[in-house]
A protein has these predicted regions:
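Residues that define the loop-to-transmembrane-helix transition and helix capping
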Residues: 26, 92, 153, 213-216
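Transmembrane helix exit motif
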Residues: 40-46, 70-83, 92-119, 205, ...
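Selective hydrophobic functional segments
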Residues: 31-85, 168-212
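Cytoplasmic-side transmembrane-helix entry/capping segments in multi-pass membrane proteins
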Residues: 53-64, 95, 116-126, 156-161, ...
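Structural signature of hydrophobic alpha-helical transmembrane segments
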Residues: 20-37, 86-100, 125-135, 184-195
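Small-residue-rich segments of transmembrane alpha-helices in multi-pass membrane proteins
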Residues: 20, 25, 60-71, 102, ...
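Membrane-interface alpha-helices at helix entry/exit sites of multi-pass transporters
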Residues: 25-32, 54-56, 149-161
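Selected transmembrane alpha-helices and immediately adjacent juxtamembrane segments
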Residues: 1-22, 108-159
């Protein structure tokens, strides 16, 4: 519901909760990914008429090579550490860097014109890495929607579509390289899928009552809190 109202926050919050409950880092990322696939897919369906298609095309064009690079890196790590499965690797060490990047983008970078659509090409590539090695690529791409002349519905829809394809693309990596069997996790995933659907429907209703200025303030505030959480992830 949080993601449906302000475009983000729900995924990272869920990732943090799952990290507490599930000890295996790779399984947290894998299960979080399929839940977010449904969550973003639901938002894409609800807001499909608001998707900024040019941004999405650029993002996907960068995402595909990014995912292939992720698969190549995972394979290289398997060979280097001489393990039988990528499930034995620790892959969540980049989270603090994402937090630092967000703070820089929001508050420290030289302000100028809004980011062009072309920037989403290389951001798609970075997301192909982040979605596998970190789990939540939303905070990475979200700052690129700040100060753009698009509506709050455009932000919600386009960001959700970008993340949907990112989570979809990483499923084969976790199935074949991390030996994740999603069918065995059905009892855990099904209730969460149902909650995601109704949360999105309610979130859309609330978004319609939210002024654009308030939305952008909440969006930036949520990004800042998420950045701080990512930077201190190894402390708490």
């Amino acid at each position: 519901m949080l993601s449906a109202i302000i475009g983000m926050g729900g995924g990272v919050t869920l990732l943090g909760i799952m990290a507490i409950i599930i000890p295996e880092g790779y399984l947290v990322v894998a299960l979080h990914g399929v839940i977010q696939l449904v969550s973003n897919g639901t938002r894409v369906t609800v807001y499909r008429s608001h998707i900024h298609k040019n941004i999405l095309k650029k993002f996907i064009a960068g995402l595909i090579p990014g995912l292939f690079l992720s698969a190549g890196l995972v394979f290289a790590l398997i060979q280097y550490y001489n393990v039988s499965s990528a499930a034995e690797l620790k892959i969540d060490f980049l989270k603090p860097l994402i937090g630092i990047y967000i703070i820089w983008f929001l508050y420290l970078r030289k302000k100028g014109k809004s980011v062009s659509d072309k920037a989403f090409l290389w951001m798609g590539g970075l997301s192909g890495l982040a979605t596998v090695f970190i789990g939540a690529a939303g905070p990475l791409i979200a700052p690129f929607f700040i100060n753009r002349k698009i509506t709050k519905e455009n932000v919600i829809a386009t960001k959700a579509a970008c993340q949907f394809f990112g989570h979809l693309g990483k499923l084969p990596i976790f199935i074949f390289m991390f030996d994740v069997n999603y069918l065995n996790q059905g009892t855990l995933l099904l209730p969460l899928f149902i909650a995601v659907y109704f949360g999105t429907k309610f979130g859309k209703m609330m978004l319609g009552k939210l002024p654009e200025s308030t939305f952008r303030l909440l969006f930036k505030g949520a990004l800042t809190l998420i950045a701080i959480r990512l930077m201190v992830v190894d402390i708490f």
